[in-house]
Amino acid sequence: MRKILLPYPAGCATGTFVRRVKRFSVEMTRDGESVWVHSNNSGSMLGLLRPGATMLASPAANPDRKLAWTHEAMRCHGDGPQGFWVGVNTSVPNRMVEAAFHAGRLPWAQGYDTFRRERKRGDSRLDARLDGPGLPTLWVECKNVTMVEDDVACFPDAVTERGSKHLREMMDIVSRGERAAMFYLVQRPDGLCFGPADVIDPQYAALFWEAVDAGVEMYPHRGIVSPVGIDLSGVLPLTRCR
């Protein structure tokens, strides 16, 4: 059996989702007690945060942190055989792309031998810079995808001016002769293709297709989420969300 690229920390726990408060705090019940969990997801997590749904939390690496748990995943469509996990931790795509690079699991990064995270370019800081002998520098920006509508995995699930800025930056990179790639980690299994959510953020959607035409590479990889961790699967085809 192939090793999972990103195993969850030891000591993860499931509980029942109660509510979200002030965007970055989630209440769950576990063994009849209320537990507050940190969420790093600033998006809407549209359709996932249903009271009574099962959620997964990991223990904080820092024992002195105010909230002792981190929100990792939500159960969608129940706990039965039709249900599945959806990963909501937005730090996962950055860690996944690095782990996949070192494991040789990114076909579009073949030949590159150096991975540097969070590198500055101009006034921006991008998630990763890859270099290799005789190859153009490859800049990578990572996004987490949790929404699926009519079999289409969509991003974003809330208006994102920051995301639009990243697309403009990636187009500028390509115009200067370097490579630019968007790594979208679709942390759920039911998306058959991928596209920008034009109903939610028309500006981002328009810039997405402009970036495609400009030569920005789009890699919406499917993530395989389980209670023990996340693995990486293939790239979904692009489509328009209509």
From Swiss-Prot:
Q: Known Pfam families for this protein?
A: SfsA (PF03749), SfsA_N (PF17746)
Which NCBIfam families does the entry link to? sfsA
Q: Which PANTHER family match?
A: SUGAR FERMENTATION STIMULATION PROTEIN A
Q: What is this protein called?
A: Sugar fermentation stimulation protein homolog
What high-level taxonomic lineage is stated for the organism?
A: Bacteria, Pseudomonadati, Thermodesulfobacteriota, Desulfovibrionia, Desulfovibrionales
Native organism is Nitratidesulfovibrio vulgaris (strain ATCC 29579 / DSM 644 / CCUG 34227 / NCIMB 8303 / VKM B-1760 / Hildenborough) (Desulfovibrio vulgaris)
- Classification via InterPro entries: SfsA, SfsA_C, SfsA_N
Family under the similarity heading: Belongs to the SfsA family.
GO molecular function terms attached to this record:
DNA binding
